[in-house]
Design a protein with these regions (language model features):
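Generic beta-strand structural signal
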Residues: 1-5, 14-17
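Terminal peptide-recognition signature
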Residues: 4, 54, 92
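Active-site segment of metal-dependent pyrophosphate-handling enzymes
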Residues: 7-11, 22-25, 59-101
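Conserved Nudix-box catalytic region and its N-terminal flanking loop in Nudix hydrolases
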Residues: 13-56, 60, 69-72, 160-164
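Nudix hydrolase/Nudix homology domain
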Residues: 24, 30-32, 85, 89-91, ...
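A short glycine-/small-residue-rich loop at the edge of a beta-strand within enzyme catalytic domains
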Residues: 37-45, 79, 83, 111
Length: 164
């Protein structure tokens, strides 16, 4: 599916925008997720799905192309409820260039948060992020903020995300 990091830079500090998932969802309730994300249906392009999900998840009526960056396409495997799953994430980044009041339209999101990089690490430590949301965030860091990781860590993450 598509996963879109919402981000902005203010006074040389990066901030990420997250959607807190509804407590009523069966999978990963109350966890923080990428600003926009959703499965890829057949019959529409990945970019059209990004626009659809941006509206449904965050009430973004029009994504401005000049603020969108295509990240990597990442294959991954995970275990959930004693089952193994595979997936593909089409990573996008959306620079939040002005103040936006995000509004969920499909009932899957409880609220939205803007979080500094330092607080992002706290969410990771406390396991408050939806597991596959971490993949697109790591991709963003590798492409834009690699100075936050030790060189050995960068090599390990790149090796994990490599699609061989």
């Amino acid at each position: 599916g598509v996963h879109c990091n919402g981000w902005k830079k203010k006074s040389d500090e990066f901030y990420f925008f997250f959607a807190k998932r509804s407590k009523h969802l069966n999978d990963f309730p109350n966890l923080y997720d990428n600003l926009v994300g959703g499965g890829q249906p057949s019959g529409i392009s990945i970019y059209e799905n990004l626009k659809k999900e941006a509206f449904e998840e965050a009430g973004i009526f029009q994504l401005k192309k000049k603020y969108i960056t295509k990240g990597n396409t990442i294959n991954y495997f995970h275990n959930h409820k004693n089952f193994a799953f595979s997936g593909i994430i089409f990573v996008y980044d959306y620079e939040i260039y002005k103040d936006i009041n995000f509004k969920n339209m499909d009932g899957e999101v409880e609220s939205f948060y803007c979080i500094s990089v330092d607080k992002l690490f706290t969410l990771l430590e406390k396991k408050k992020l939806k597991p596959n949301a971490i993949i697109s965030i790591a991709d963003f860091f590798l492409r834009n903020l690699s100075e936050y990781f030790p060189k050995k860590g960068i090599l390990e993450i790149k090796n994990i995300l490599k699609n061989d």
